[in-house]
Amino acid sequence: MEPSADTHSKPVDIYRDTWVRFLGYANEVGEAFRALVPVGAVWASYGVATTYVTADAIDKGRKAAAAHGERPGKAVCVCVAVVDTFVWQALASVAVPGFTINRVCAASHFLLSRTTRWPLPVRKWTTTAIGLSTIPFIITPIDRSVDLLLDSSLRKLYSEGEKED
């Protein structure tokens, strides 16, 4: 989430370049606290992240519609923008990091229960702290990996469609 060196050529994307981006990580916080809170709280954190993903997709669709104007193919342009954003956000903000934090916490709790004699509450809080501390380290690698995945798969379909127009 560092501001890019070339801030003059690209407008700020509120969903990716500001504090709003952290709403996409709400489910990771929920996963980190899974051992300490009711499962409903974890699911609620996924609701926050999903709302964030949906808002970004709608925003990108509106911007694509405005940029396209009244030229033919507007619906396709908007659809591509919405699908690309939704898939990217669903992977980079919800699915991959949620799974990653869930597994880090599960492995941490398992290892702590096997290697320490700490009381259960201490193990749970330690697991939560490990999960939360992992979040800053996984964000950039996951974002870049999802970009690479989409660039080598789904986005190739979009660019082929643009060449045909």
Curated annotation (Swiss-Prot):
It is found in: Mitochondrion inner membrane. Keywords: Apoptosis, Membrane, Mitochondrion, Mitochondrion inner membrane, Transmembrane, Transmembrane helix. The chain crosses the membrane at residues 35-55, 76-96, 130-150. It is a multi-pass membrane protein. One of its GO terms (cellular component) is mitochondrial inner membrane. InterPro entries: Mitochondrial_18_kDa_protein. GO terms for biological process: apoptotic process; mitochondrial fission. Involved in the mitochondrial division probably by regulating membrane fission. Loss-of-function leads to apoptosis. Belongs to the MTFP1 family. PANTHER family: MITOCHONDRIAL FISSION PROCESS PROTEIN 1 (PTHR11001:SF2). This is Mitochondrial fission process protein 1. The gene is mtfp1.
